[in-house]
Curated annotation (Swiss-Prot):
It catalyses: N(2)-acetyl-L-ornithine + L-glutamate = N-acetyl-L-glutamate + L-ornithine; L-glutamate + acetyl-CoA = N-acetyl-L-glutamate + CoA + H(+). Heterotetramer of two alpha and two beta chains. GO terms for molecular function: glutamate N-acetyltransferase activity; L-glutamate N-acetyltransferase activity. Substrate binds at T162, K188, T199, E285, N407, T412. Belongs to the ArgJ family. Its EC number is 2.3.1.35, 2.3.1.1. The active site is at T199. The gene is argJ. GO terms for cellular component: cytoplasm. It is found in: Cytoplasm. HAMAP family: ArgJ. This is Arginine biosynthesis bifunctional protein ArgJ. Its main location: cytoplasm.
Amino acid sequence: MRDIETIDTLNQLNIDLQGDVSSPLGFIAGGLHCGLRRKKVDFGWIYSTTPATATGVYTLNQFKAAPLKLTEDSINKDKALQAIIVNSAIANACTGEKGMQDALDTQAWIAEQLNIEQHLVGVASTGVIGSFLPMDKIQYATQHVLKEQYNKSEAFNQAILTTDTMTKHLSVKVEIDGTTVTIGGTAKGSGMIHPNMATMLGFITTDANIDANTLDYCLKQSIDQSFNMITVDGDSSTNDMVLCMANGQAQHTQIDALHPEWHKFVYALNFVCHYLAKSIAKDGEGATKLVTVKVKGAHDVVEARKIAKSIVSSNLVKTAVHGEDANFGRIVTAIGYASRYIEPSATHVSLCQVSVLEKGMAVDFDEQRLKEELASDNILIEATVGNGEGEAAAYGCDLSYEYVRINASYRT
């Protein structure tokens, strides 16, 4: 799958599933093992050869981790970053003043190593909550950032992982003003995933020339439709965020909402965010199936999103999917408690393109055919809930015995 390069001819998008955050002009990514984990790469970086316009979206969890708060404050100074540092294994969350000082020290060491201003360094951590970082190991790692033998983007893609079973990355190219613009993305996430930013880190880079306000708007719109529409287990974490850097090294007229081809950039960014979000959902802890829920006919898009999230978050729906059980009553129940604007007599539900509910009433269907469809590793649930114009899609996974095993022994 990752060796495929495709072209979306309709939208003039070149898609490289081997690409990542190092694909756009002027970006370098790398990683190394500094001893936070037993053997695996655990410290990574993204560096732009020139300062980049930057924006981010952050967890809604009230226990925000120190590195997240520091990065948010740093970006707010002048909407720019030049480097991002990430460690896995330890979240540096619920660590008080020492945790914040550790994040500040990491930021300062990187700024000195790269000879850049301190506020241009973003810091991110992911892993076990409540443990302090071994700062001697972190300092060692910062002294090796950008050394040639470690500047391998796949090392960065690996360094940010926790319980993930695979790396998640791609890049896309689109023509703007006759110039090739590249957007690259790398993400991590497998458990503690729920809408409105959860246990996931997402990093997006681009060589596009785009003003800060437009970049911020585009990223937030894309995340509302992608990262905020995935769930694995309903838990939202303390650390996690999506950061986007645009260094402007592609030579084209600056993009803003009035640019005649700005829709191309928006489409490309949406594609990257959706691909990464679905990759996280598919790699949910213990997951065996990707679940896609599409809702239409809702009162508005807000209600459509609530209903789609309700279905994909339901543990009863998730366990039925895992058991390949055509128990559509669980889907109907999740629709019914999600919104007060549901029109039961105008509600239709299909499971794997097999109609199971029409006008609010169960219908006969081919049980054997549906059983065969449910054996697939990609499950589609579609629901029309009325005659409104609201549409939305959400992504999740099944809930398996393996999920319990992984999370019962996470610290051990």
